[in-house]
């Protein structure tokens, strides 16, 4: 080290320590110096490990953003920011009137802002699951749509129709008219409030193409919907807004707070067009509110028919 300084070389103090430590270890353990990797090799190995770690983190991030993941038979992960969605929801842990099973799920994204707003789950009452194949039977499908592909199976034709912009609205409407009870679970991915949730529902319903033909009924129903939001204030992310479409077409709204571990009734909407238009927007049209939800719903219904 003295000779190096005498030549005017600038050597980092940390490197002197490494040299001194290696020399001392050689004497202690009786090793030859050639068995110790040069410091450049150590740095290269460290850099390689660091890059590998970054790659693994990136890979994990890509996996987490890939879309809904089925964790097990009892729940599905819709988005990593919120709790997994339970496949079966029923009283008394909720204020639902009966037991429901999850058929479709996915995030609701605001495209022009580029972020996810909430996780959505579409459920059907367990007692009404047998109604789906009865309503969407081959005879009905052929009468409703003359262009049914004879080369495909019945389930394939149903799946294709549920993904079609026009046919999907017809099928969802037929299920609702046939008495199938639906339920939507909305779980905010970001902190929000009841006013934003209410305004989002109103906007979605007003965007339904049949609204203009039913202005009086829709106007009356939207006022009922606004009145149903009896609770005000903030809604933390991961809480649940539960919208149950009952057999008579009315909507029952309830709220579940995870922090307080309680459910509370919000209100109800008696005008049947409001519920029908809302669930049609979730599952039908050329721009459904959550395309992944419609996709998973269509895949599940295919297995039922």
Curated annotation (Swiss-Prot):
GO terms for molecular function: intramolecular lyase activity. It is found in: Mitochondrion. One of its GO terms (cellular component) is mitochondrion. SUPFAM superfamilies: Chalcone isomerase. Residues 1-22 form a transit peptide. InterPro entries: Chalcone_isomerase, Chalcone_isomerase_3-sand, Chalcone_isomerase_sf. Keywords: Mitochondrion, Transit peptide. Belongs to the AIM18/AIM46 family. This is Altered inheritance of mitochondria protein 18, mitochondrial. It comes from Lachancea thermotolerans (strain ATCC 56472 / CBS 6340 / NRRL Y-8284). The gene is AIM18.
């Amino acid at each position: 080290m003295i000779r190096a300084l005498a030549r005017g070389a600038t050597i980092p103090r940390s490197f002197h320590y490494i040299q001194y430590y290696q020399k001392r270890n050689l004497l202690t353990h009786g090793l030859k110096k050639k068995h110790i990797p040069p410091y450049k090799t150590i740095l290269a190995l460290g850099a390689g490990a660091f890059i590998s770690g970054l790659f693994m983190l990136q890979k994990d991030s890509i996996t987490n953003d890939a879309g809904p993941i089925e964790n097990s038979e009892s729940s599905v992960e819709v988005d990593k920011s919120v709790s997994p969605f339970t496949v079966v929801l029923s009283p008394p842990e909720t204020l639902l009137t009966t037991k429901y099973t999850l058929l479709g799920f996915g995030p609701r994204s605001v495209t022009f802002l580029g972020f996810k707003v909430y996780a959505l789950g579409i459920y059907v009452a367990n007692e009404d699951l047998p109604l789906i194949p009865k309503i969407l039977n081959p005879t009905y499908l052929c009468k409703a749509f003359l262009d049914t592909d004879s080369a495909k199976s019945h389930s394939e034709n149903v799946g294709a129709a549920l993904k079609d912009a026009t046919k999907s609205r017809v099928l969802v409407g037929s299920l609702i008219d046939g008495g199938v009870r639906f339920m939507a679970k909305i779980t905010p991915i970001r902190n929000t409030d009841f006013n934003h949730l209410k305004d989002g529902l109103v906007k979605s319903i007003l965007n339904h193409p049949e609204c203009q033909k039913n202005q009086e009924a829709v106007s009356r129903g939207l006022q009922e919907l606004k009145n149903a939001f009896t609770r005000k204030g903030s809604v933390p992310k991961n809480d649940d807004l539960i919208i149950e479409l009952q057999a008579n077409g009315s909507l029952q709204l309830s709220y579940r707070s995870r922090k307080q571990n309680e459910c509370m009734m919000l209100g109800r909407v008696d005008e049947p067009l409001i519920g029908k238009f809302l669930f049609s927007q979730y599952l039908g049209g050329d721009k459904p509110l959550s395309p992944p939800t419609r996709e998973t719903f269509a895949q599940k219904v295919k297995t039922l028919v």
